[in-house]
Amino acid sequence: MSPRAACLTTLLLLAGSAHAQSTAAPTREHLAPKGWEGSYHRIHYTPVLKVGDRVIVSGIPAAEGKDDEAKIRWAFQQLELHLKAAGATMADVVELNSFHVAKDHAEFRRRLEPMLKVHGEFFKANYPAWTAVATPALYSEGAPVEIRAEAIIGSGRRPRADIPKPPPPQPKP
């Protein structure tokens, strides 16, 4: 084989190998922070699922604390631990869902107040997409809220938010 043919053959083999690597299915890792192993083995759900650079955190009940605000703060601290298990941070969170125990709209709005406060402590800028839902009950009795999240590892390193501030509200005549 001529040197030119050998070089072309090598390039084709390398290109084929690179293509095979880029089209391979991402890895899927089931993870659980210390203390959450029972979720996987007894209740049969994965606390943290890592697929490639995507991290999915199952619902974390706000179960520990003296009041709703403390319980919610505990849940966000647990979220940090869950993300860390997969190599992600709070800055990498791209979506947040929260499920709030409430019997009607008025109670939902009231119970959302401590969530808004604590959410602001953990997300100071470049906020994730967020959906808050009222529900009559959660699996963990006494938990006022449960949070789940999705993150993309590394996405929080250089976020960009080009959203202008709204104009101040105008007084009503």
Where do the model's predicted regions map?
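N-terminal presequence-like segments and the immediate start of the first folded domain
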Residues: 14, 19-94, 100-173
